[in-house]
């Protein structure tokens, strides 16, 4: 909804969703209730549009992107899927399609910042810490999900890849917890998550890179218990003669508990630290984001959504024209535009240079 409303200020926007209930919340925007997991439905729908903005659950993200590219339409996407997006690069080039992936906050804005500095300095270290949390810390979960619950659970089981001394290291998710202090928030806990994604390939010249997720301290313990007990497993088990995947049951049970209710507020926190040499001198840059629920809009929707709409504007206005799959770091040259676009909408990144 945030993205549709923002884009509708300057463009003719149509929102498509499988849920009529979701569409009913959008005032003054054209809506179509349809199932975009069906290729034919999707490709017929997008025939007369200049740009597709994708925001679907991860399990259907890759296929949706492929279907859009096959139809020859430009796409800017924030869906987080486990498949390698570069698998669609050849197809996108054949079809002459501009396809920008992972256009959220991290991956997303973090990559744009990285790409911007990579063109100006020799980076040796990149660290990104990021989390979206409820302002009110409540037992037992101390967490609320603004994404599809199965995507959140996926983060807790997908092995985390990071780069140390130019070697890729894989560890299990939720490992290497650290307590970290943040102004205005206090102590949060970080742990390894698989957020580097495309950077492992595109920034292979940077010897040290890591991305970690932030939660309230102690949250990791119960997640590890649930994981070790099999609640996040995709392998079917038989219960009273019915075969079910434990992860589906867990998502079903947790979603109402994790869902943000009316009156709930969230915040997004991100800290990026880059170290290296610039003009022959050792430097470090630290970017800090603390964004809070504002104007009845979820912070995570603002921080991810406005990054995506900034890039959508660049593509639809012909200012970003690189054909093929583009991870956000390729848009480093448009950093100032995206940063200003976010600032105009109240999402402010503060930078400290040392």
Predicted feature residues:
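Conserved Rossmann-fold cofactor-binding substructure of NAD(P)-dependent oxidoreductases
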Residues: 36-51, 60
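Rossmann-fold cofactor-recognition segment
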Residues: 27-38
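Beta-loop-alpha module in the N-terminal Rossmann-like domain of NAD(P)-dependent dehydrogenases
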Residues: 51-67, 81-84
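Rossmann-fold NAD(P)-binding glycine/threonine-rich loop
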Residues: 78-101
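Conserved SAM-binding motif I beta-strand of class I
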Residues: 15-16
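C-terminal catalytic/substrate-binding lobe primarily of soluble NAD(P)-dependent oxidoreductases
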Residues: 119-354
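N-terminal Rossmann-like NAD(P) cofactor-binding module of classical short-chain dehydrogenase/reductase
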Residues: 46-55, 75-77
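Helix N-cap at the beta1-alpha1 junction of Rossmann-like dinucleotide-binding domains, i.e.
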Residues: 19-22, 82
């Amino acid at each position: 909804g945030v993205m549709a409303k923002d884009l509708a200020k300057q463009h003719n926007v149509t929102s498509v969703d499988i849920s009529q209930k979701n569409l009913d919340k959008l005032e003054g925007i054209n809506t179509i209730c349809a199932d975009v997991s069906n290729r034919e439905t999707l490709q017929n729908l997008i025939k007369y549009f200049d740009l597709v903005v994708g925001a679907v659950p991860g399990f259907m993200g890759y296929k949706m992107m492929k279907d859009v590219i096959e139809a020859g339409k430009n796409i800017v996407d924030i869906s987080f899927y486990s498949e390698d997006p570069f698998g669609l690069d050849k197809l996108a080039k054949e079809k002459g399609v501009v396809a920008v992936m992972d256009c959220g906050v991290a991956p997303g804005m973090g990559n744009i910042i990285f790409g911007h500095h990579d063109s100006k300095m020799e980076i040796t270290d990149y660290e990104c810490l990021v989390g979206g949390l409820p302002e009110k810390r409540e037992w037992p979960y101390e967490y609320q999900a603004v994404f599809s619950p199965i995507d959140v659970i996926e983060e807790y089981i997908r092995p985390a890849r990071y780069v140390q001394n130019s070697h890729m290291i894989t560890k299990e998710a939720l490992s290497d917890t650290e307590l970290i202090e943040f102004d205005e928030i206090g102590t949060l806990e970080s742990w390894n998550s698989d957020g580097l994604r495309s950077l492992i390939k595109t920034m292979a010249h940077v010897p040290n890179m890591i991305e970690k997720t932030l939660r309230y301290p102690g949250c990791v313990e119960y997640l590890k218990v649930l994981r070790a007990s099999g609640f996040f497993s995709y392998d079917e088990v038989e219960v009273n003669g019915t075969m079910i995947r434990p992860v589906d049951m867990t998502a079903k049970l947790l979603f109402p508990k994790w869902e943000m209710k009316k009156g709930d507020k969230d915040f997004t926190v991100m800290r990026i630290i880059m170290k290296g040499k610039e003009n022959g001198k050792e430097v470090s840059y630290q970017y800090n984001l603390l964004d809070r629920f504002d104007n009845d809009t979820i912070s995570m929707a603002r921080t991810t959504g406005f990054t995506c709409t900034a890039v959508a504007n660049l593509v639809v206005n012909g200012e970003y024209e690189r054909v093929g799959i583009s991870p956000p770091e390729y848009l480093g040259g448009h950093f100032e535009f995206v940063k200003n676009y976010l600032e105009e909408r109240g999402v402010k990144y503060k930078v400290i240079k040392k």
